[in-house]
């Protein structure tokens, strides 16, 4: 009988005085998502993250939105990062590295990832307005910082150019999604090895 591949899934439930969040991910999914954070623009961005990474995501977040969106966005990034790290396990056999330049109309953004186990964010993105609708643009960076720290990934995001702030934010999410899609894929040539001369990525 053929050996069954291990399931690459991860689930996290996180509750604080500010938020209550549950997240489940499947790295070998098809980009299906069920997302509810109470923040419409953020839900739209997370849908892009799931769709273009092909990572199935179930996200339910309830936060102190009567104060602002900050805690909900940051804590959702924490939970997604932790769930992805669980799904990666010891990171054996993964492609590990990926980068992409992603275009959307007038905007071009680059994302590069290393699933190194070493969390780091390089953020070179500037918005020309403090809000997209009612969403604070500074929260885009807060989300990716929380994601990188808790997934244990090195993440570089560089916006080359763009005029529309919605497009700039959306290309950040889509570019990271496409880079994660490649980096998390199993490379059959690795034959189950950890892709590091150190022998470990955790």
From Swiss-Prot:
InterPro entries: IGPD_sf, ImidazoleglycerolP_deHydtase, ImidazoleglycerP_deHydtase_CS, Ribosomal_Su5_D2-typ_SF. Its EC number is 4.2.1.19. It is an enzyme of class 4 (lyase). Keywords: Amino-acid biosynthesis, Cytoplasm, Histidine biosynthesis, Lyase. It catalyses: D-erythro-1-(imidazol-4-yl)glycerol 3-phosphate = 3-(imidazol-4-yl)-2-oxopropyl phosphate + H2O. One of its GO terms (cellular component) is cytoplasm. GO terms for biological process: L-histidine biosynthetic process. GO terms for molecular function: imidazoleglycerol-phosphate dehydratase activity. Belongs to the imidazoleglycerol-phosphate dehydratase family. HAMAP family: HisB (MF_00076). This is Imidazoleglycerol-phosphate dehydratase. The gene is hisB.
């Amino acid at each position: 009988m053929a050996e069954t591949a291990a399931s690459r899934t991860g689930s996290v439930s996180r509750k604080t005085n500010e938020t209550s969040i549950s997240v489940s991910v499947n790295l070998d999914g098809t980009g299906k998502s069920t997302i509810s954070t109470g923040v419409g623009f953020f839900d739209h961005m997370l849908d892009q993250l799931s769709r273009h990474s092909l990572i199935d995501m179930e996200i339910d977040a309830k936060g102190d939105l009567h104060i602002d969106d900050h805690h909900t966005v940051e804590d959702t990034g924490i939970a997604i990062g932790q769930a992805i790290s669980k799904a990666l396990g010891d990171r054996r056999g993964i492609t590990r590295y990926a980068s992409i330049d992603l275009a959307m109309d007038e905007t071009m953004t680059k994302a590069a990832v290393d699933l190194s186990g070493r969390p780091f964010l390089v953020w070179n993105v500037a918005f020309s307005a403090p809000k997209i609708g009612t969403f604070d643009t500074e929260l885009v960076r807060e989300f990716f910082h929380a994601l990188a720290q808790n997934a244990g990934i090195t993440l570089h995001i560089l916006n080359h150019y763009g005029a529309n702030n919605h497009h700039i934010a959306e290309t950040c999410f889509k570019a990271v999604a496409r880079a994660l899609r490649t980096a998390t894929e199993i490379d059959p040539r690795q034959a189950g090895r950890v892709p590091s001369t150190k022998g470990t990525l955790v």
